[in-house]
């Protein structure tokens, strides 16, 4: 009603020729003002307060249906949209969530879940979690704030705690209220305490477990910790029997009498159950005794005197430079004597070498020289070293000389061999005629 009268009177801060407060608001201005007021009220409405207890499991579901109306174009009444939506959660002013708070969302078409066990250090301190929703189809965003006010529990922590490993569950399935309620009901039938609370839920992947194969509907597994105010029942104590411990060491299932109460919906690995009795644990906490904050008196400060004694570094110089230099000089002289004064020389080597070896070496050098000269000029006569010395049939000595008008450099090899004097004739095969033995 006040808003209606304010709109009729106009803007009191507007100035016209007739005075102040006589200007009417246009419909566009009115619409903008109403949209601003609606935005402010919707932002206040988006901040949600929750009051979990320290040491008790906290679960908050981020429903996609709740955020669908935040993205334009706004759906009409009765219209159903199935846009993919993901969430990003962080502590206000920080890039990540608190250490005790976890978040999981399997697919953009499923709801997100915030879960964890608040600690006693945050009791009385409001924890503001920024929740940003992303519409993956329209790329629109919406941001809400979740204010977590952690309350102190009556009995924290509960003295008796048991951790179960459920093999046929994923963490988001176990966080459902009806599933978690069924599990706590089964534990209560076995344990029969007066108070029973779920303390924490952890995925097996966070404990180093393997990702299951996508066959036979395999699950990751979940660790569920519960606490009670009475001692463990005899059924839970059966895991500590030597027979069951032996079966667990052999990778066999232990025999537990109360397993049938869980087997309907929950497959528990009894070898991984953990029983913790807080009443028998010795506290290692030592109270810190704070002093006055004054350091003990160490006496009067005495700085070093201005007149320092002179120090001679000549000996240090000799040890550091002179000694290595002298050793290097001696080694250099020894090396020079070996390289320069201990050489045999060519004459001494020839005197110690036999004559036959020298002649053989000299003939090899001469032949090598002739071959090199041939490669430079191929129009010269054959070298003497390639001519035959003895006739292969008669054994006569043939002088290794050529006639002056004999030139075989341009003659084929076979023809040159046939024209040589004293050359043995090679018999030619007969093409016609008879053959007689």
UniProtKB/Swiss-Prot annotation:
GO CC terms: cytoskeleton; dendrite membrane; Golgi apparatus; plasma membrane; sarcoglycan complex; sarcolemma
Compartment(s) where it occurs, according to its Swiss-Prot or TrEMBL record: Cell membrane, Sarcolemma; Golgi apparatus; Cell projection, Dendrite; Cytoplasm, Cytoskeleton
Effect of residue 60 to P/R: Misfolded, leading to the interaction with TOR1A, ubiquitination and a decrease of the half-life. Impairs intracellular transport. No effect on glycosylation
Keyword Cell membrane applies: yes
Known tissue expression: Identified in all tissues tested. Expression highest in lung and placenta, moderate in brain, heart and skeletal muscle, low in kidney and liver. Also detected in embryo.
Record membrane topology: Single-pass membrane protein
Keywords: Cell membrane, Cell projection, Cytoplasm, Cytoskeleton, Glycoprotein, Golgi apparatus, Membrane, Transmembrane, Transmembrane helix, Ubl conjugation
InterPro entries hit by this protein: Cadg, Sarcoglycan_alpha/epsilon, Sarcoglycan_C, Sarcoglycan_N
Record PTM text: N-glycosylated.
Residues passing through the membrane, by range: 318-338
Topological domains annotated Cytoplasmic: 339-437
SMART domains: CADG (SM00736)
Effect annotated for changing residue 196 to R: Misfolded, leading to the interaction with TOR1A, ubiquitination and a decrease of the half-life. Impairs intracellular transport. No effect on glycosylation
Extracellular-facing ranges: 1-317
Glycosylation positions in this chain: 200
Reported function: Component of the sarcoglycan complex, a subcomplex of the dystrophin-glycoprotein complex which forms a link between the F-actin cytoskeleton and the extracellular matrix.
PANTHER family: ALPHA-/EPSILON-SARCOGLYCAN FAMILY MEMBER, EPSILON-SARCOGLYCAN
Entry's family note: Belongs to the sarcoglycan alpha/epsilon family.
Name the record gives this protein: Epsilon-sarcoglycan
């Amino acid at each position: 009603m006040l808003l209606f009268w304010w709109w009729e009177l106009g803007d009191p801060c507007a100035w016209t020729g007739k005075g102040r407060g006589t200007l009417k608001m246009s419909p566009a201005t009115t619409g903008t003002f109403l949209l601003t007021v609606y935005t402010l009220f919707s932002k206040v409405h988006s901040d949600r307060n929750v009051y979990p207890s320290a040491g008790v499991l906290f679960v908050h579901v981020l429903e996609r249906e709740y955020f669908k109306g935040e993205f334009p174009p706004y759906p009409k009444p009765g219209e159903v949209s199935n846009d993919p939506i993901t969430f990003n959660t962080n502590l206000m002013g920080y890039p990540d969530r608190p250490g005790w708070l976890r978040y999981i969302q399997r697919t953009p078409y499923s709801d997100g879940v915030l879960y964890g066990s608040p600690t006693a250090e945050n009791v009385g301190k409001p924890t503001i979690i920024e929740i940003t929703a992303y519409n993956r189809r329209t790329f629109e965003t919406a941001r809400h704030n979740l204010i977590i006010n952690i309350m102190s529990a009556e009995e924290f922590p509960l003295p008796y705690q048991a951790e179960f490993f459920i093999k046929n569950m994923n963490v988001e399935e176990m966080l459902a209220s009806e599933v978690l309620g069924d599990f706590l009901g089964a534990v209560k039938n076995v344990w029969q305490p007066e108070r029973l609370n779920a303390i924490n839920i952890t995925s097996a992947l966070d404990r180093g477990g393997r990702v299951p194969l996508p066959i036979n509907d395999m699950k990751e597994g979940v660790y569920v910790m519960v606490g009670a105010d009475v001692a463990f029942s005899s059924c839970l104590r059966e895991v500590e029997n030597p027979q069951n411990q032996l079966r667990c060491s052999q990778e066999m299932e232990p025999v537990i009498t109360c397993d049938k109460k869980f087997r309907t919906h929950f497959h528990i690995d009894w070898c991984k159950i953990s029983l913790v009795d807080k009443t028998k644990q010795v506290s290692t906490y030592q109270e810190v005794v704070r002093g006055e904050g004054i350091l003990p008196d160490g006496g009067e400060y005495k700085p070093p005197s201005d007149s320092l004694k002179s120090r001679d570094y000549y000996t240090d110089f000799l040890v550091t430079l002179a000694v290595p230099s002298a050793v290097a000089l001696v080694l250099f002289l020894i090396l020079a004597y070996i390289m320069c004064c201990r050489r045999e020389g060519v004459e001494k080597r020839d005197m110690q070498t036999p004559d036959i070896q020298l002649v053989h070496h000299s003939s090899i050098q001469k032949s090598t020289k002739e071959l090199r000269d041939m490669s430079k000029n191929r129009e010269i006569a054959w070298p003497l070293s390639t001519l035959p010395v003895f006739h292969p049939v008669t054994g006569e000595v043939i002088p290794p000389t050529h006639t002056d008008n004999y030139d075989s450099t341009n003659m084929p090899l076979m023809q040159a061999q046939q024209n040589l004097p004293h050359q043995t004739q090679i018999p030619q095969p007969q093409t016609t005629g008879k053959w007689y033995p």
